[in-house]
């Protein structure tokens, strides 16, 4: 028999300020010791591709909770953001920590067919991996400290290998930056062309190319700070939603009669 466990409210932060998604009820089919329902607060972190999540994120015995909401805003938000079956919404809980790892607790909300579900990220394996890596670094440090003068050739070889790896890393970094910029240009171009089609603006119109170009240039200028950071090797990306919002705003401005 299903039982309501808690109600989740989480905050979205954007260019227009903060919006709170309210009244997300979490229900479970498993028996629980507590009979009272609590209220959780959280903060939106990011969208993720469920197919690309590490295997340790979700253990085999983990609870999956059914999500319901009577809030029209929440329903509209999930309908809009979870159209892709593989997409998940990551929420960091403000007043709860993972009991096993003592790190911030995270929920991932996703759609499974017509149902809205969520699960708590299992950080146990990550904590174990981090501990093993730390231990390995300590052991390597002790080994290096005990290297004799006769072993200095190994250090020279290792330094040479590290320089080669550094060169390859630099090349990969430049390729990665170019790929991100190309992806930005392709996404921006598709959004502009789609926006023009939705407005019934045919490419046979005299000013079509001019309208396309000024929209493209204005969007690049709007996101110049993000593009500059990307060119410097930042791992961040200009989100699809942010770029779509920019294009829509510009087209509304440029196509006013």
From Swiss-Prot:
In terms of superkingdom, the source organism counts as Eukaryota
Alphabetic keyword roster: Cell cycle, Cytoplasm, Cytoskeleton, DNA replication, Nucleus
Q: What is its main location?
A: nucleus
Q: Which Pfam families match?
A: Sld7_C, Sld7_N
- Which GO terms of type biological process are on file? DNA replication; regulation of DNA-templated DNA replication initiation
For the keyword Nucleus, the answer is yes
Q: Where in the cell is it found?
A: Nucleus; Cytoplasm, Cytoskeleton, Spindle pole
Please provide, in alphabetical order, the Gene Ontology terms of the cellular component aspect for this entry. Answer: cytoplasm; nucleus; spindle pole
Q: Function of this protein?
A: Required for the proper function of SLD3 at the initiation of DNA replication. Binds to SLD3 and reduces its affinity for CDC45, a component of the replication fork. Required for mitochondrial morphology.
Indicate the quaternary assembly.
Interacts with SLD3.
Q: What family classification does the UniProt entry report for this protein?
A: Belongs to the SLD7 family.
Q: What is the protein name stated in its UniProt record?
A: Mitochondrial morphogenesis protein SLD7
